[in-house]
Amino acid sequence: MPDKKVDRLSRVPLFAGVSRRELEFVASLVDEVSLKPGQTLITEGQPTEAFFILESGHVEVTRGGKPVNRLGPGDFFGEIGMLDRGTATATVVTDGPVEAIVLSHTQFRDAIKANDNLALQVIAAMAKRLRADAGT
């Protein structure tokens, strides 16, 4: 297992509290991708095919064609669709070059099934986003 990938994952806030052994398992599942400016990663109303963790660069998040957020290194998106297999609640487009860690639905499910800490981190992050969307 390349230590480089584990080290990169260890710097992502989502993986805080995850042991090195658990990180090694997650690292064995993930893919790393380089994305071009203007690339649509998730389309509102369409099935979500992947979970993304940004390593560098930024993405714009829109809902109903209106900007709602800008995400950067350490941020992640696509988790809701990974959990419920429903359609995306927003569109996400790269705003310049982006380096990201990507997990397919199967990879994501395997990662959270094997790691209670990671599952709790994802749930906590989802709750935080729901509160932010509700304005509370």
Positions of PLM-derived features:
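Cytosolic regulatory regions built on CNB/CRP/Popeye-like sensor folds
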Residues: 1-136
